[in-house]
Amino acid sequence: MDAEGEQKSNGVKEPNTPLREALDEIFLNVGYLLRSLLANVPNALYHSQLQAACQKFQDYCDLEEIRIIEAKRVVERDLRSLEAKEVEEKSQFASFVSATPPGANSLQGNVSLPSGNNFFTSSFDSENISKPGEVSLSESQLLGNLNQQSSIQLPDRMPKTTNGTLADPNMPPKTTVNDQDVTKDASQQFGGSNFSNYLRDNDSFQFGMNTDASGDAHLQASEFLLPNLFGNSSTSPQDNFGTSNSALSRNLDLFGSPSSENKSTAGSASLFPNQQMGIDLQAQENYSAAFGNDGSFASHLTNTFDNALNLPTDIPTTESINDLFGENFDFTMTK
């Protein structure tokens, strides 16, 4: 008994049991698992970051596609409204030309309208319509004045008159001219041009415009078209739902937005004030939501994608497993 105890105390190795072999196998597998896990963790993080960046890029592409579709709808709607406005203006102009009395637009008209009922001065009265073939009083007066004007023969040099009568009896031939007739003849001589001016100043009555805009009754279609799509842009990407200026000056930035200084003022000058304000507000709401206030589409896409990624250029490295367990760590737990 004592000999066996001494043999054990002298360091004689005992034979391996099945339990000890199983434990050694378990610790060896755990070591391999730890090595594999620590080596693959940085790669997994890099892969997850790349997947997240790709997902952001896909979402951004979907958003830009939605904006392009909305912008297309806005452009199509504006073109339809432009066509409808042109058709309406043409119909109003045709009705105005057909309703204009003969000789009203003549530059040398000698006929002035009577002070009776007409479509500019008073409401239409059906009772004053003359029968076919019947000459009205105003027409008879007009014909009489014309005959009287044709019968007057004035000398080469107009002599002095006293109350409309020639003072010198030796002057040939004596002709009595009434001051009232002369005044009336002058009004007939210049009545046509005055009436034309009256018609031009009263375009607002026919077209529903203010007096200042009456000269621009026939608006050009180019004044309603959208701004230039291919202008140079120096603006940086900003929010998609607001503009500092009106949307017509900084609107279509898909290929570059023109500056507000380069915008022509002819369209805004010829538009009616209420209509111009409505177009500005409506365009600001639609164009700002559709395109935002960005610069060029390519630069905005590149900047957004680069800012969203922010990935390292090299795959990150990990610490060695020896720094965690030591250089001489024995996973087999053998002595």
UniProtKB/Swiss-Prot annotation:
The modification Phosphoserine is found at residues 257, 260. Residues 152-179, 252-271 are annotated as: Disordered. GO terms for cellular component: cytosol; nucleus. Keywords: Phosphoprotein. Signal peptide: none annotated. It comes from the Eukaryota. The keyword Phosphoprotein applies. Residues 257-271 have a biased composition (Polar residues). Transmembrane segments: none annotated. The keyword Magnesium does not apply. This is Uncharacterized protein C4F11.03c. It comes from Schizosaccharomyces pombe (strain 972 / ATCC 24843).
